[in-house]
Regions:
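N-terminal active-site segment of His-dependent metallophosphoesterases
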Residues: 1-51
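Active-site neighborhood of divalent metal-dependent phosphoester bond hydrolases
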Residues: 28, 45-138, 176
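Active-site environment of divalent metal-dependent phosphoester hydrolases
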Residues: 9-13, 40-43, 69-74, 157-158, ...
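Well-ordered alpha/beta subsegment
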Residues: 238-240
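A general structural motif
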Residues: 27-30, 59-61, 146, 184
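Short, glycine/charged-enriched secondary-structure capping and boundary segments
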Residues: 17-20, 47-50, 78-81, 164-165, ...
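Acidic, His/Gly-enriched loop-helix segments that form or flank divalent-metal centers
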Residues: 98, 104-205, 209-215, 221-236
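Residue-level marker for buried hydrophobic side chains located in beta-strands
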Residues: 4, 32-34, 64-65, 149, ...
């Protein structure tokens, strides 16, 4: 049995509720995989990071993977900010569409049109603890548990797992979600927001859209089946 949580996107209160549902179902310290995107859009990215760091430091059975938003955050905090080449031209991490502005706000850094980009960057580097940067930058990209393969975005169909690139593992979308190939294991991922976590035969999408205000719904995998965890208990996630 293993639990999983999709994209959190700064929703600390939702994360607390999801963890409470997991504890109610599985006890004090069951294995939990987080598939990335802890920052951006929601109101408390800092709080989410601190909660994850505290859990890992306390020895909880948590596997915390890295997502594309987590990488964008750490890249922005380099000596010279790096923009991810997967972004569309003219769209920066600080744009509200991506939500970097709310991440910096959780550290007390205001992103406004009246401020110079260099001043925002300098204040951000001073405000964000190096421990937070290191924690996100050092997260693994994948986790294998039996016939479950956990990853942030997905995999490149037809490419052996050891040859998958970091960019695909945290950024791939249409080439993965539109492919019905049997990958030889169930790919459990986030990244592509849906209305709720959904089983699609060859993959299980955990991203129920918490970054857009929808609930953060944890999932439990046990004996080849999957269930959503709700206040009423387990709800079977049938393949669609």
């Amino acid at each position: 049995m293993i639990y999983a949580i999709g994209d959190i996107h700064g929703q600390r209160a939702m994360l607390e509720r999801a963890l409470a549902l997991i504890e109610k179902d599985g006890g004090a310290n069951p294995p939990v995989v987080f598939v990335g995107d802890y920052t951006d859009r929601g109101p408390d990215s800092r709080g989410v990071i601190e909660m994850l760091m505290a859990g890992v430091a306390a020895g909880r059975s948590w596997t915390v993977l890295r997502g594309n938003h987590d990488r964008m955050f750490t890249w922005y905090l380099d000596d010279v900010p790096r923009e991810d080449p997967h972004l569309f031209h003219g769209l920066s991490w600080l744009n509200p569409r991506l939500g970097g502005n709310t991440t910096l706000a959780s550290y007390g850094v205001a992103v406004t049109e009246t401020r110079r980009t260099g001043d925002i960057h300098a204040e951000a580097r001073a405000a964000v603890p190096q421990a937070h940067i290191d924690f996100l930058a050092n997260r693994p990209l994948t986790h294998q548990h039996g016939d479950l393969f956990f990853v942030h975005a997905g995999i490149r169909p037809g490419v052996p797992i050891p040859e998958q690139t970091e960019n695909d593992l945290i950024w791939i979308r249409q080439d993965f979600v539109n492919d019905a190939t049997d990958h030889g294991r169930l790919i459990v991922h986030g990244h592509t927001a849906t209305d709720r976590p959904t089983h699609f035969f060859n993959r299980f999408n955990l991203d129920g859209g918490a970054g857009y205000g929808r609930p953060l719904i944890p999932v439990v995998f046990e004996d080849g089946q999957a269930w959503l965890l709700t206040d009423r208990g387990r709800v079977r996630a049938e393949a669609t």
